[in-house]
């Protein structure tokens, strides 16, 4: 299954995506937790700060009101110059303060003279000394500031009360202290109603560690808790208390601590919820991506698989195949170049097949002509041998006549008989000469035809050699394309290796392209070797045809010379026959003209010797011609064999 390129791409993309998802989930988990923790801290800090500002703002409003009362002219006049009018105005003032704010439990003044004035009116013991009370002492110690006492529970109402005090000064001398008893219920309600995220809550504690506001432990003192002691000693901060995140801040000069608390597990619950949501989203995206990558890989590798099938068909010799691709990427370019290569190969093989057919036909014709020429030359050689034999015999007889010319008178009858024999043999020689001329004419005609066919074959071989050179150039171009494709695939593999894991899919595609280029290179090499073999055999055949042409030229020259000799022999034989006839007619006068006869016989002897020599030369030329014809025949057979092998090679291709 993993031998398929599209499966490799799909599996590779899936593995990379799984690794990416795992890394993203791990990164999300590792980064989300501190981010959520930090966000929780920031949120609760903002809540705590807002709560602290609201409480401080409320306390400050009471401090401003109390400062106005303590520093007011009415209060100063009431304390330093008491009168009914001053008392009335002062009481109206504090009454208005009390009536306008339900959280002011009581407004009052204690003087240095140990007098006590309150609203609402309250009864005090006769020995009650306001200057001995904590609220008075604190204000007297810091006359320029509003001071706050520790909160306490009202014994009558049960409400938590805090007293704010401000010294009344006269020439920088404390003459009294103005105070408000404030109900903390408003602040407690504000704290208890404060919404804190992550299922948290707000709390308020005084400087002694008493919880003024808390959803479950209100009124409890937590000053003995070591962790909370750290909170009490610092102005503000964040503490992790038993898995609870506590954010706290000090309120102004009161020393109170307002804070918020939430469970850190709630932060992790949100983180886990987000991680689970991310996990499901990642799984769905992973499945969709795997499916899409599978079909994308099929889309990419489909044209390559088609091209592999077409390449195998071409390597098997089928040049009718064509690959289809409408894309304009590298695969599309490779497909179009493949189709162009197959088309060019088809045209070249077709041309080679046609040329091979012509060469084969011409070779057969040349073989037939060579066979006929060889047979005719054999007949000529036989005739020339007969002529040579007759000429030799004639020379011998003439020599005998010459030797016995002295006894011609006594052997006239024998001379007459011999003359008759000479006449008959002369006729035979004349007939043989005419036959030799006819045979020589046939030989010349066949030799010319053979020469013409040889020229045609030589021309065709040159054309074939040029065609094979064209094939070799195209094959070289194809080989260069394969080498370039292989080099590009190698470069793509190097670039993919540089890209690391993200480039591994491109490395696999590049490796497949490189293998395809190597297969094309092997096929091209096989074609190149076949073409080189054809070129070698064509060159050998061409050289043989050139040699045959040269031999034909020499043969034609020898035939012309033989024809001239035969014409001479024929003419001489005609003269010889006429002479013999004359001898035969004048035999009765031979004795009277013996000297003339002797001279004539010597002349005949010389001519006979020349005829014998010419016949031997013709015979030798004929033998050479036979050898040449054998070579021509052998060359044509070699050419025919090479043409047949070429046809068999071309037959492997389907056009």
Swiss-Prot record:
Residues 298-350 form the HAMP domain. Residues 148-225 form the Cache domain. Residues 369-619 form the Methyl-accepting transducer domain. Residues 30-276 are extracellular. Residues 1-8, 298-655 are cytoplasmic. InterPro entries: dCache_1, HAMP_dom, MCPsignal_dom, Sensor-like_sf. This is Methyl-accepting chemotaxis protein McpC. The gene is mcpC.
């Amino acid at each position: 299954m993993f031998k398929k390129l599209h499966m490799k791409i799909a599996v590779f993309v899936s593995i990379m995506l799984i690794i990416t998802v795992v890394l993203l989930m791990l990164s999300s988990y590792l980064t989300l937790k501190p981010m959520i923790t930090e966000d929780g801290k920031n949120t609760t800090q903002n809540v705590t700060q807002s709560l602290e500002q609201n409480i401080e703002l409320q306390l400050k409003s009471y401090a401003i009101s109390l400062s106005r009362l303590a520093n007011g002219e009415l209060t100063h006049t009431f304390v330093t110059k008491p009168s009914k009018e001053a008392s009335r105005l002062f009481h109206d003032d504090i009454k208005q303060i009390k009536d306008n704010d339900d959280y002011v439990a009581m407004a009052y003044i204690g003087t240095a003279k140990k007098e006590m004035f309150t609203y609402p009116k309250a009864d005090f013991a006769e020995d009650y000394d306001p200057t001995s009370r904590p609220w008075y002492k604190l204000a007297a110690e810091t006359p320029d500031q509003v001071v706050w006492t520790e909160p306490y529970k009202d014994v009558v109402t049960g409400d938590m009360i805090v007293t704010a005090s401000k010294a009344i000064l006269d020439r920088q001398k404390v003459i009294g202290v103005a105070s408000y008893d404030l109900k903390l219920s408003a602040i407690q309600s504000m704290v208890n109603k404060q919404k804190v995220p992550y299922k948290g809550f707000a709390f308020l504690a005084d400087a002694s560690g008493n919880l003024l506001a808390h959803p479950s432990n209100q009124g409890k003192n937590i000053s003995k808790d070591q962790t909370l002691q750290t909170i009490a000693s610092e102005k503000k901060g964040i503490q992790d208390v038993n898995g609870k995140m506590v954010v706290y801040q000090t309120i102004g000069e009161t020393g109170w601590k307002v804070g918020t608390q939430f469970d850190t597990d709630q932060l992790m619950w949100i983180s886990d919820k987000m991680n689970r949501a991310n996990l499901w989203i990642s799984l769905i995206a992973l499945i969709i991506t795997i499916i899409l990558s599978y079909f994308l890989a099929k889309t990419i590798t489909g044209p390559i698989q088609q091209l592999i099938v077409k390449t195998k068909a071409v390597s098997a010799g089928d040049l009718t195949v064509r690959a289809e691709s409408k894309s304009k990427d590298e695969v599309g370019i490779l497909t179009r170049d493949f189709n162009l290569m197959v088309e060019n190969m088809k045209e070249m093989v077709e041309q080679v097949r046609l040329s091979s057919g012509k060469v084969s036909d011409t070779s057969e014709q040349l073989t037939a002509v060579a066979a006929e020429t060889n047979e005719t030359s054999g007949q000529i050689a036989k005739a020339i041998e007969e002529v040579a034999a007759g000429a030799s015999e004639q020379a011998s007889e003439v020599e005998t006549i010459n030797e016995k010319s002295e006894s011609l008178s006594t052997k006239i009858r024998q001379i007459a008989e011999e003359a008759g024999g000479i006449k008959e043999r002369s006729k035979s020689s004349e007939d043989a000469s005419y036959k030799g001329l006819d045979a020589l004419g046939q030989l010349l005609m066949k030799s010319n035809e053979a020469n013409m066919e040889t020229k045609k074959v030589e021309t065709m071989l040159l054309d074939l050699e040029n065609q094979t050179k064209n094939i070799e150039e195209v094959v070289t171009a194809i080989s260069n394309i394969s080498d370039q494709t292989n080099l590009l695939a190698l470069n793509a593999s190097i670039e993919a290796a540089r890209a690391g894991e993200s480039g591994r899919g491109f490395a696999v595609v590049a490796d497949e392209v490189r293998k395809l280029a190597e297969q094309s290179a092997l096929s091209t090499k096989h074609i190149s070797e076949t073409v080189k073999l054809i070129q070698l055999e064509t060159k050998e055949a061409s050289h043989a045809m050139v040699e045959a042409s040269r031999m034909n030229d020499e043969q034609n020259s020898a035939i012309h010379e033989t024809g001239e000799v035969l014409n001479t022999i024929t003419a001489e034989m005609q003269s010889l026959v006429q002479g013999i006839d004359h001898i035969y007619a004048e035999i009765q006068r031979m004795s009277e003209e013996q000297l003339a006869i002797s001279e004539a016989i010597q002349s005949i002897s010389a001519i006979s010797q020349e005829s014998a020599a010419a016949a031997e030369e013709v015979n030798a030329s004929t033998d050479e011609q036979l050898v040449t014809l054998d070579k021509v025949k052998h060359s044509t057979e070699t050419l025919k064999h090479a043409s047949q092998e070429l046809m068999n090679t071309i037959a492997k291709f389907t056009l």
